[in-house]
Amino acid sequence: LSSSPHAAFVDVSADFETLLLVKSAEELDMIRYAAALGERACEAFAARSRAGALESAPIAAALEAIVSGGGWLGGPLVIERAGAQRFAWGKPEWMSMGRPRVLQSGDSIGAEIFAFYGGFESQQQIDVSIGRPGPLLRELEEVCAESYRRGAVKMPVGARFSQLFDPISQT
């Protein structure tokens, strides 16, 4: 800055972001394909989520679906959690704590999957219940559903999420 004392700096970040949002037909096709790969990954994840399976099996199936479809993986690849009372996301614990846990009836396993294609990323979030969901998961499901209902009633066309925060947070 000292070498350009008369320079004027102008914030163009909003205008630049607007330019980046415009996509060609080809770019939109790649974005749609990335999303389709992510959906295939979710199908593979759900198919491999069952009692007796290692929690790593659904993750492996999801990643295989992306790569075999011509996509690629970007960090963090996937964030995951499994168990009857585990509801936080993070890197899979078996990566630093040893053998993946064996899924049991009453568990749920959830993940956020990142599918890349043509330089574009899609993100899918999935949660699979192994057998009947336990009481805590059912209670959390009801809280989420009620929050959604309250927000949907208050949501005018063109609303911003910030306008929905109050009705949703009162659940």
Predicted regions mapped to residue ranges:
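Active-site neighborhoods and metal-handling regions in enzymes and metal-associated proteins
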Residues: L1-T171
